[in-house]
Amino acid sequence: DIRWLTGFTGGTAQLLVSRSNHEAWLLVDGRYFERAVDETTASRASVHIERVVPDVSTDEMIARIVGTSSLAVDPSHVTAHFMNVLQGHCSVVHERTQLDDLRRVKDDSEISLIASAAGIADNAFASLVSDGLFGKTEKQIRNRLDHLMREAGADDVAFDTIVATGPLGARPHHEPSDATVEDGHGVVIDFGAMVQGYKSDMTRTIRVGAVSDEYQRMFELVLEAETAGVASVKAGVVGAAVDAAARAVFIREGVDHECVHGTGHGIGLYIHEQPILSPRCTAVL
């Protein structure tokens, strides 16, 4: 949120915004002070940069700025301990920010960066597959794909790349191991690239060797579900309706119990952003 609002990309920081006059203060570790000045200037953010000094705690600095005013804090973004400490210095009220709702609508520059990250990941994946997967371990495939994305211009990977071969592919968040890709395996790869903080996220499954009738059937069902879900995406539609459109294909075929995750999610500076397309999603697209 701080990066999105101010452009600052450094480590731990706190941002205070005055409701009365809209003044803002960015509290940063002294090691990031110059960086904060440069990055907030470049992003044209109107914010006072305050250096956190060793002999004064962050909560004390916040209390000095807030004074006798009340401090609204989003409890989902701070620890209970920090909340308790703040309450010892100033009047604290719990209030959820609206930043998630604001951030889910991307501007043209954000969309361009996400598209760039997706393009890098897509091309890296194509190179990976052309080299072949048979006989390689999950870790080797992970390392090679990560290298290809960075070599193609990614600032970094978007998250820890997942590679799962054979039966391990049933684990959505499997950690790559020394398991080797064998003939007849399906290899699930979940990966993404990052460009200027913005991320891409895609999952691909490659069948090594002959494709069985059952595997072909499942491929066609997933493709049909994806097509139905994409077709249902329109302005004004509730997120749960998109999930339902995709999930209906699996329900029809009696395999919905195998679909243990949501249909999709937003993406940006975080890998998972609103809206989260699940049966519980009430957000309007």
Where are these regions (language model features)?
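Active-site neighborhoods and metal-handling regions in enzymes and metal-associated proteins
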Residues: 1-285
